[in-house]
């Protein structure tokens, strides 16, 4: 029997530079853009863990802590926090990374992901 993957094996970081097209009317990063980036990271974490295509089934928590602005470097860090029979919980913490390398948290989210079989149905089978 093959040993399952550890959460560390599916850890994912993604980096975005905020540009003017990403801003809302208040010249801050549009929340919907950040949520889209978060969803992508959650999907990559779950896919790496399960070895399958995945889908988002729920957002358990999504907290906007601080704003981000044009030219900010956004770092999204995703890690697996729970694995059930068919679902996985992924925690994504988003930061603004400053030129000196320090990071300030701007968002924390928990997404529930499900691995899919060939018929796009939830499956407990891990590859």
Where do the language-model regions lie?
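Conserved interaction-surface patches within small, structured recognition/assembly domains
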Residues: 57-67, 75-80
